[in-house]
């Protein structure tokens, strides 16, 4: 059977072409496009474990890529696909822990407020997915809400709603924008993300160009911003079969002078531990707190002045809240749930061939739309619906360069709760307590 990355010459859609679950369906430099290079040539069954997924993924990639190839244009076998859009996966994971930010504007002490915002920032490593989420189509949008609840009574807090919006603003390269805001607590979050996996021979390196900015408006109209200057990289190494984050970056609040050096440590070949993380929080140049542990279990915080320690984050018991979405029939055609509905249904029925056919149909339609747009205007540039590019930011600015266009009025029409844990593979169990920071 021949399964090639789609070229300019369009091929008919058949059952045999389904194994080419291409993320974009265009020819890519470094991608093997020879006969029998499709997924079905080597993938016959679903791996039972994460290590099994990793081994098969590496074997498939090793046989299909040249060193240095950009993997965003690699045909992705069904075995490695998670039937949920990247926009949905990331935004839902952001949403379920957003309650951590709602208390931050009311914390009077600068250091404790910084730690609370940092605690929310450090929920991002839980966004790791063993399987690849679906690459959003251009103009795809995902929207949801969280109706916050009282931690003690578990009762809904009237008027305490956080609104979430994500949009795919570019397909090549794949760039996604994210925003959420809560008017009651005057908080907002902005992010621009471009994730690019690259095959390096003995490992897969994931370049993570992620810019985030959290904005708080405190009493008296005082505004504070919290942002990262760069981000980590991800690695899947031959024979280790675990996905690791590695690298060091800064998370800062210029208005208060507090900052954190966040260091995801590489595990040595001998000794050490997996997913090791150390964070030094400073006021100016003076270190104040040492946070250490792993980003899959427990982080402990130590006050460097009085040497007292306590739990900062317990990733196993962190409280989460459900996501609320509009019913399927009320969604627009470019909503993530509607775009990938057929793919999700195929996987739910364990019919990966039909899921693949639906995925290919969606991507073929996107390519045809792109051709039509370029035929009408050779200089065509897609204009996002919810995000506006900010040309006033300097080229080296570390903040997201797209501004969210907040709607004039926010409404909650016929929203229904979504079981986020069913959609997000590594969702954290719900618990009724939030680990408290120890001074």
Curated annotation (Swiss-Prot):
SUPFAM superfamilies in the cross-refs: Oxysterol-binding protein-like (SSF144000)
InterPro entries recorded: OSBP_sf, Oxysterol-bd, Oxysterol-bd_CS
Entry superkingdom: Eukaryota
Any one GO MF annotation of this record: sterol binding
Compositionally biased tracts (Polar residues): 409-419, 429-439
Chain residue ranges for the region called Disordered: 1-40, 409-439
GO-annotated cellular components: cytosol; membrane
Gene3D superfamilies on file: 2.40.160.120, 3.30.70.3490
Classification via Pfam families: Oxysterol_BP
UniProt cross-references to PANTHER family, sorted A to Z: OXYSTEROL-BINDING PROTEIN 6, OXYSTEROL-BINDING PROTEIN-RELATED
Family named by the database record: Belongs to the OSBP family.
UniProt-recorded name of the protein: Oxysterol-binding protein 6
Originating species: Dictyostelium discoideum (Social amoeba)
Gene this protein is translated from: osbF
């Amino acid at each position: 059977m021949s399964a090639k990355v789609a070229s300019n010459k369009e091929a008919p859609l058949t059952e045999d072409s389904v194994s080419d679950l291409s993320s974009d369906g265009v020819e890519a430099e470094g991608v093997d496009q020879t006969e029998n290079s499709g997924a079905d040539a080597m993938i016959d069954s679903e791996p039972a474990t994460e290590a099994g997924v990793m081994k098969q993924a590496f074997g498939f990639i090793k046989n299909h890529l040249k060193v240095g190839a950009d993997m965003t244009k690699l045909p992705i076998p069904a075995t490695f696909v998670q039937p949920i859009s990247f926009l949905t996966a990331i935004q839902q994971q952001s949403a379920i822990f957003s309650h951590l930010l709602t208390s931050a504007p009311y914390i009077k002490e600068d250091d404790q407020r910084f730690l609370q915002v940092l605690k929310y920032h450090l929920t991002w490593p839980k966004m790791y997915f063993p399987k690849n989420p679906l690459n959003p189509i251009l103009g795809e949008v995902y929207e949801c809400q969280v109706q916050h609840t009282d931690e003690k009574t578990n009762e809904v807090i009237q008027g305490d709603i956080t609104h979430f919006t994500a949009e795919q603003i570019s397909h090549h390269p794949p760039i996604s924008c994210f925003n959420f805001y809560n008017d009651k607590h005057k908080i907002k979050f902005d992010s621009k993300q471009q994730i690019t996996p690259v095959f390096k021979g003995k490992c897969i390196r994931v370049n993570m160009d992620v810019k985030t900015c959290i904005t708080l408006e405190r009493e008296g109209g005082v505004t504070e911003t919290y942002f990262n200057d760069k981000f980590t990289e991800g690695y899947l190494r031959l024979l280790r079969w675990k996905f690791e984050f590695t690298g060091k970056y800064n998370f800062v609040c210029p208005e208060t002078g507090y900052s954190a050096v966040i260091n995801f440590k590489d595990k040595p070949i001998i000794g050490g531990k997996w997913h090791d993380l150390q964070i030094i929080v400073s006021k100016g140049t003076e270190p104040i707190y040492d946070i250490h542990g792993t980003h899959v279990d427990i982080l402990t915080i130590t006050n460097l002045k009085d040497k007292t320690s306590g739990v900062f984050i317990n990733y196993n018991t962190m409280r989460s809240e459900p996501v609320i979405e509009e019913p399927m029939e009320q969604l627009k055609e470019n909503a993530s749930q509607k775009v990938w509905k057929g793919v999700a249904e195929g996987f739910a029925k364990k019919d990966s061939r039909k899921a693949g056919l639906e995925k290919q149909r969606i991507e073929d339609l996107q390519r045809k739309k792109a051709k039509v747009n370029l035929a009408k205007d050779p200089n065509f540039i897609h204009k996002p619906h919810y995000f506006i590019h900010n040309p006033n930011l300097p080229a080296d600015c570390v903040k997201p360069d797209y501004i969210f266009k907040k709607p004039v009025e926010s409404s909650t029409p016929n929203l229904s709760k979504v079981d986020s844990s069913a959609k997000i593979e590594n969702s954290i169990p719900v618990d009724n307590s939030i680990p408290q920071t120890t001074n």
